[in-house]
């Protein structure tokens, strides 16, 4: 009976190692993906990667008004938040297969 238990344990460990490798690969793929967040009808665009690093900020010239810097700041903030929300959605889609059935707050 002990022997069967050890075999099951080894099988479970192998499955966990396989899952760990697959998760690592998915995280590497996630880092290579990019998303765009926009605000003001595309007047401000923020590009982020899957690790929530901002890679680029694009601002259309016509939105730059020296007399209304606050509006530009709001658009940049909104576009950044939109990009980060999309990264979260992408991470949930990609990593969700590994966390299905697990209810761990803050994990993807």
Swiss-Prot record:
Comp. bias (Basic and acidic residues): 19-32
Keywords assigned: Cytoplasm, DNA-binding
GO cellular component entries: bacterial nucleoid; cytosol
Family annotation (SUPFAM superfamilies): YbaB-like
Pfam family, one: YbaB_DNA_bd
GO MF assignments: DNA binding
Compartments, as annotated in UniProt: Cytoplasm, Nucleoid
Gene3D superfamilies associated with the record: Nucleoid-associated protein YbaB-like domain
Composition bias, Low complexity: 9-18
Keyword DNA damage applies: no
Family of this protein: Belongs to the YbaB/EbfC family.
Known partners and oligomeric status: Homodimer.
Protein name listed in UniProt: Nucleoid-associated protein GTNG_0017
Organism: Geobacillus thermodenitrificans (strain NG80-2)
Lineage: Bacteria, Bacillati, Bacillota, Bacilli, Bacillales
């Amino acid at each position: 009976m002990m022997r069967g238990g050890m075999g099951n344990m080894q099988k479970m460990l192998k499955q966990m190692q396989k899952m760990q490798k697959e998760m690592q690969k998915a995280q590497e793929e996630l880092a290579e993906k990019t998303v765009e967040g926009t605000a003001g009808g595309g007047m401000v665009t923020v590009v982020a990667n899957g690790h929530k690093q901002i890679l680029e900020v694009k601002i259309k010239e016509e939105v730059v008004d020296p007399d209304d810097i606050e509006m530009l700041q709001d658009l940049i903030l909104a576009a950044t938040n939109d990009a980060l929300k999309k990264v979260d959605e992408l991470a949930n889609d990609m990593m969700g297969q590994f966390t299905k059935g697990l209810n761990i707050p803050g994990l993807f």
